[in-house]
A protein has these predicted regions:
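Glycine/small-residue-rich loop that forms an oxyanion/phosphate-binding "nest" at active or ligand-binding sites
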Residues: 54-79
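Active-site/ligand-binding-proximal alpha/beta "capping" segment
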Residues: 164-219
Length: 240
């Protein structure tokens, strides 16, 4: 017989919507059967709530979703991990919207990017909205929160090319702008301000995603999640 969750456990799960509580406990929450099942392969399961051990009302109390999906899990966060990729990396400089971060993680998973460098002011990857938006991709993509300018400086000194999307960059669809042999770091910036000046000065290969038609009025910028997908798609296309 499955033991019913206690009131204390339900209250604890609810408290993990706050970052300070997730950090203090070293855990995070995921919702939805598919997302939970994907994450079980990569993270230690601490608590599982299903209709077998929690009522619908109790699941609603624990959920951060408007329409709870019936399965809620608490997982232990990863320990600090080393960067394992020898191919492309993505670096995020102040991406603050949880939905954008979740979309970028899912996009990186699709295009085979296994490590993302994040500035300290990038959104928390264990925020419930981020976890939900990744659709389980967090199991396969590792995020590293670092002093981003310092890390990128070290990588540049090691000879890694640093790509960044800038309005003054080169049209990335022009020949030889993106190499066939791919390694390096693709840097994406903050939703409102783009790439910070300190990081911008480190970029070795500025890229431009051109608007169409050329020289006609258009939107001021692209959503950072969409821009990341466009850049990664072009890199992988050149690598085929």
């Amino acid at each position: 017989m499955v033991e019913h969750l206690s009131k204390a456990q339900i209250k604890w799960v609810r408290s993990l919507q706050l970052k300070k509580n997730r950090d203090a406990e070293g855990v995070f929450v995921a919702e939805g059967e598919k997302c939970v099942n994907d994450l079980r392969d990569a993270f230690e399961l601490v608590l599982l709530a299903t209709p077998e051990n929690a009522s619908r009302i109790e699941i609603e109390q624990m959920s951060s979703l408007r329409n709870p999906q019936g399965t809620i899990a608490v997982f232990r966060k990863r320990e600090n991990t080393e960067i394992e990729s020898s191919d492309l990396l993505v670096a995020l400089d102040g991406v603050q919207d949880p939905g954008n971060l979740g979309t970028i993680i899912r996009t990186c998973d699709w295009f085979g990017i296994h490590d993302i460098l994040c500035s300290k002011d990038t959104a928390d990857c264990y925020n419930p909205k981020v976890v939900q938006a990744t659709m389980g991709a967090l199991a396969r993509v590792r995020l590293h929160y670092e002093d981003l300018p310092r890390m990128l400086t070290q990588m540049k000194e090691q000879g890694l090319p640093l790509y960044g999307t800038l309005l003054e960059g080169e049209n990335m669809y022009q020949p030889n702008v993106i190499p066939n042999k791919q390694h390096g770091v693709i840097i994406m910036g903050n939703e409102g301000n783009g790439i910070s000046q300190e990081v911008r000065e480190l970029i070795t290969h500025p890229l431009l995603i051109p608007s169409y038609p050329v020289n006609t009025p258009t939107s001021e910028s692209l959503n950072v999640g969409i821009a990341t997908a466009i850049v990664l798609a072009e890199f992988r296309r050149k690598n085929n």
